[in-house]
């Protein structure tokens, strides 16, 4: 199916607001029977949930396990980027050998393209590093609350960069999210489990997630619109930029002193973490392809709720009513924002006027 190219301003608008591309939805749905589409969607959503939740728990083990006692969060992140880079290169080579069996773009390291992707790579490094640092210092149960301000930053950046105002109802949902965030911080403090450092890392991770959406749309033309090429260059740049950080923060010395450095179990878990890091990008794309960005947001919110409950049960934690209320406020506010934006998209035309397009381009 031939698809008309999207303007950069429209792509950026979709990235920040969660709008869907009608042609993409039509292509994803096609003419398949309803039951087949429903089964595909159920399988893809389940795969996303299992991959995402497993990755969070595994990263928590690698970053803050009492039995592992490994205090090298930057190295863990670096290794996951290295695994992703090798997987991309391996799949590219496999696709060249078996073009009919494996569908993957050819990858060749071009320094000019790497330089073009560099601004995004810096944001990408911030996103994955702050994510892991947040997870290191806060519990899995509080992790979603600690990183709950992504929607708020999306609204803020939409105004600052796209000059796009947000409706009263959407702002109201953001207020609910912020209220839930502060109530969660208050309750973590009341229970004596609050880590201000982890909370700050969570806020920074939320900011980087929003910035990542902006820079992704700006950089995609440099890699011919290929998400896999962008993933490859992002992770190559990240591996290089992480090396001086490992030296400056003394993590290489800490790694040399690590008691389980020669353990096959340790390296197996590290590699599994890298595999999950690679897989989450793939299953996220699958979920958006078979549903829509808005449905993906709803699925992510529901997954966060299930992840919180699983974390409380797994770690045998006891939480207060107000703590649960803070989680429900964050998850409810996020769901309400998704619903409000979807409702507003249906009321207004998808295509902006030429004047709006010029204003959006100038904002970027």
From Swiss-Prot:
Which disease relates to this protein according to its record? Answer: Congenital disorder of glycosylation 2C: A multisystem disorder caused by a defect in glycoprotein biosynthesis and characterized by under-glycosylated serum glycoproteins. Congenital disorders of glycosylation result in a wide variety of clinical features, such as defects in the nervous system development, psychomotor retardation, dysmorphic features, hypotonia, coagulation disorders, and immunodeficiency. The broad spectrum of features reflects the critical role of N-glycoproteins during embryonic development, differentiation, and maintenance of cell functions.
Role played: Antiporter specific for GDP-l-fucose and depending on the concomitant reverse transport of GMP. Involved in GDP-fucose import from the cytoplasm into the Golgi lumen.
Q: Which family does it belong to?
A: Belongs to the TPT transporter family. SLC35C subfamily.
The residues that cross the membrane are: 34-56, 76-98, 111-130, 140-162, 167-185, 195-214, 227-249, 264-286
> Biological process (GO) annotations?
'de novo' GDP-L-fucose biosynthetic process; GDP-fucose import into Golgi lumen; GDP-L-fucose biosynthetic process; GDP-L-fucose salvage; lipid glycosylation; negative regulation of Notch signaling pathway
The answer on whether this UniProt entry bears the keyword Disulfide bond reads no
Alphabetically ordered keywords of this record: Congenital disorder of glycosylation, Disease variant, Golgi apparatus, Membrane, Sugar transport, Transmembrane, Transmembrane helix, Transport
An example of a Gene Ontology cellular component annotation for this protein is: Golgi apparatus
Write the protein's name. Answer: GDP-fucose transporter 1
Q: Any keyword Membrane?
A: yes
Subcellular location per UniProt equals: Golgi apparatus membrane
Q: Which PANTHER family match?
A: SOLUTE CARRIER FAMILY 35 (PTHR11132)
List the membrane topology term(s). Answer: Multi-pass membrane protein
Q: Which GO terms describe its molecular function?
A: antiporter activity; GDP-fucose transmembrane transporter activity
Catalysed reaction(s)? GMP(out) + GDP-beta-L-fucose(in) = GMP(in) + GDP-beta-L-fucose(out)
What is the source species?
A: Homo sapiens
């Amino acid at each position: 199916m031939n698809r008309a190219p999207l303007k950069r301003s429209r792509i950026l608008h979709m990235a920040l607001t969660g709008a869907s591309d009608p042609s993409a939805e039509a292509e994803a749905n096609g003419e398949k029977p309803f039951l087949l589409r429903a089964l595909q969607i159920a399988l893809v959503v389940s795969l996303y949930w299992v991959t995402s939740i497993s990755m969070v728990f595994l990263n928590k083990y690698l970053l803050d396990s009492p039995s592992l006692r490994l205090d090298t969060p930057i190295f863990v992140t670096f290794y996951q980027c290295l695994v992703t880079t090798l997987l991309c290169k391996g799949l590219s080579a496999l696709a060249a050998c078996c073009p009919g069996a494996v569908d993957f773009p050819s990858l060749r390291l071009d320094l000019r393209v790497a330089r073009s992707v560099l601004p995004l790579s810096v944001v990408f490094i911030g996103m994955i590093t702050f994510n892991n640092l947040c997870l290191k210092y806060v519990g899995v149960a509080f992790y979603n609350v600690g990183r709950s301000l992504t929607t708020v930053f999306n609204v803020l950046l939409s105004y600052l960069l796209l000059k796009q105002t947000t409706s009263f109802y959407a702002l109201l949902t953001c207020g609910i999210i912020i209220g839930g965030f502060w109530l969660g911080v208050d309750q973590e403090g009341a229970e004596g489990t609050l880590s201000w450092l982890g909370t700050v890392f969570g806020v920074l991770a939320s900011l980087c997630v929003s910035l990542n959406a902006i820079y992704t749309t700006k950089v995609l033309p440099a890699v011919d619109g290929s998400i896999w090429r962008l993933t490859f260059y992002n992770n190559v740049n990240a591996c290089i930029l992480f090396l001086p950080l490992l030296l400056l923060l003394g993590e290489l010395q800490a790694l040399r002193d690590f008691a389980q450095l020669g353990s096959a179990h340790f390296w197996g878990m590290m590699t599994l973490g890298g595999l999950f890091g690679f897989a989450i990008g793939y299953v996220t794309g699958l979920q958006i392809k078979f549903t829509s960005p808005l449905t993906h947001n709803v699925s992510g919110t529901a997954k966060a709720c299930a992840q919180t409950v699983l974390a409380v049960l797994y770690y045998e934690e006891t939480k207060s009513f107000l703590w649960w209320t803070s989680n429900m406020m964050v998850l409810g506010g996020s769901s309400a924002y998704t619903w409000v934006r979807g409702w507003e998209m249906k009321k207004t035309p998808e295509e902006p006027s030429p004047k709006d397009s010029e204003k959006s381009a100038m904002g970027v």
